C-alpha cells in the first residue's frame, strides 16, 4: 500500500533538507522575530517564546474528546501496545494530560520533572501551575510508531460546571497551548453519545484558528446499523456546525478504532476505507513536519506584527502626566475602533488580529506607560523575513516533497494496512523474518489444535495444498476483527512470503486469531516456537 521499504539516498537527502529548513527557521526566529516579541511583551498576551525543542521535536498528535469516547483505546490501537499508567473503562479513566513518547524502556515521568527537561518541548507549560503539573505526565515506551510521532492523550471532558471548577487549572488555555504546537488534532465522538457539553464546546472554541489541523473521528460506529449510522452522522454534522465557527465542513472519519471484533459488521468496507484515509493523514506528518513548522512560524510572525502595532498605538495615545488611568480605560473600551484604524492604516487582514474581547481582558492587567513606541527597524526585519527569507526556504521544502518516497510512520496498526490480501493496492514487498535463537526441534505450540484447523482448511478447497490470499481473506474477515489486525496476522502467518497459506501457515493464522479474540496481543516478530516445523527447516537451509 505504501512504499516504506525503499532505501537509498532519498531518505538521507530528505533528512538533510528538513535539518536545513529547521535550522534556518530557528535562526530566523532568534534574530528577526524574537526581538520584536520581547520588545512588545508578546508572551504576556499570547504564547510564550519558542525554544529549540519546539523546532526539533517530532510531530505531535493531540487526541481530545468527552469521557469514554475511546481516546486511550484509540491510542493503544495505533500503537498495538498498552500505554504505561493508562486505564480503559466506561467511566472517566484518564484524569490527566499524558504525552505518549518514545523511550528505550517503559515508564512514566511526572509533570514537574518533564517541564525542566530542555530536550522536551514542554518547558513553557510551567506557568499553568502546580495543579496542572500534577495532572501532566509523560509515558515512555519502545514502540516503532513513536519513533516518528508523539501523541498527547487528554482528560475526558465532562458536562456541568462542577467538573470545570474542580480541575484547578485553565483547561481550555492548556488545550490552546497544545493546539499551537501539535501537527494534528483528533476530536473523538462516541456514536452513542453525541451531546456536546458546555466544557467540550469551550474546548473546541479554544482550538479556533487551528481548524486546518482538526480531524473528527466518529468512534464506536460498529455498534449501530447502517440506517442508524446515517442519522448519527447527520446529527454530528449539525452539532459541529453550531460550535465550529467556520463555513468549511470538518473532515469526519467513521470507524471502530480498537482491536475487538466488529459488533455490527454491515459497514466493514466503509470502516476500512475511512481508517486508511485517517492513517494516511497520520503517516504523512513526518514528511510535512518542516512545512508545518514554517507555516506556524509565519502565522506567529503575522500575529506578532499586529501585536506590535496595537501596543505602540496604545503607547502613543497615553498622556505623559495626568489622567493615565482614565485614558487606559477609554482605550480598552475603544479597542474595536483601534483595530479598525490599524487595519486600514497598515493594510492588514482582519484575520491577523487577535480576539478583541480577550485582548481587552488582558490589557486591564498591564501598565500602558511601560509599553514601547513603534520601532521601525524591528518591523523592517520582520517584513524582510516574511517576504525574502521564508521564500528562500520554499525550494528546499519542494525538494523534500519531491524526493520523499515513504510515509514516515511505521509499526503498530499501520503495519496491518499493507499485509497480503488486506492491501488495497496489491501485495507488498518482502518483510524481515522473525526472531532467531530457539531450537529447531522445539515443540510447535499450534500442534494440539491443528486437527481442528485442518478441517476448516480443507473445507475452504485449497489448490495444490495451498489457500489463496482471496480465499483466506474471506474466511479471516468472518472473525470480524479489524483489517489492520488481520493484516498483521497475515504478515506473521505467511512465513515463506509466497502470498498463500499452506495447512501449517493456516493453522498458525487460526491460532493467532483465537489468541486475539481472547484479548491477547500480537508479537511484533514471529517467535521461533510459533514458526511451523517445515518452515524452520527451510529457514535453516537458507541460512
UniProtKB/Swiss-Prot annotation:
It holds the Pfam family Dynamin_N. Residues 449-537 form the EH domain. Residues 481-516 form the EF-hand domain. GO terms for biological process: cilium assembly; cortical actin cytoskeleton organization; endocytic recycling; endocytosis; plasma membrane tubulation; positive regulation of endocytic recycling; positive regulation of myoblast fusion; protein localization to plasma membrane. Residues 521-543 are annotated as: Disordered. Residues 219-222 are annotated as: G4 motif. The modification Phosphoserine is found at residues 3, 44, 438, 468, 470, 484, 493. Ca(2+) binds at residues 494, 496, 498, 500, 505. Residues 55-286 form the Dynamin-type G domain. It is a peripheral membrane protein. Residues 91-92 are annotated as: G2 motif. InterPro entries: DUF5600 (IPR040990), Dynamin_N (IPR045063), EF-hand-dom_pair (IPR011992), EF_Hand_1_Ca_BS (IPR018247), EF_hand_dom (IPR002048), EH_dom (IPR000261), EHD_N (IPR031692), G_DYNAMIN_dom (IPR030381). The very low intrinsic ATPase activity is increased upon interaction with liposomes. It is found in: Cell membrane; Membrane, Caveola; Endosome membrane; Cytoplasm, Cytosol. Belongs to the TRAFAC class dynamin-like GTPase superfamily. Dynamin/Fzo/YdjA family. EHD subfamily. The EH domain interacts with Asn-Pro-Phe (NPF) motifs of target proteins. This is EH domain-containing protein 2. The gene is Ehd2.
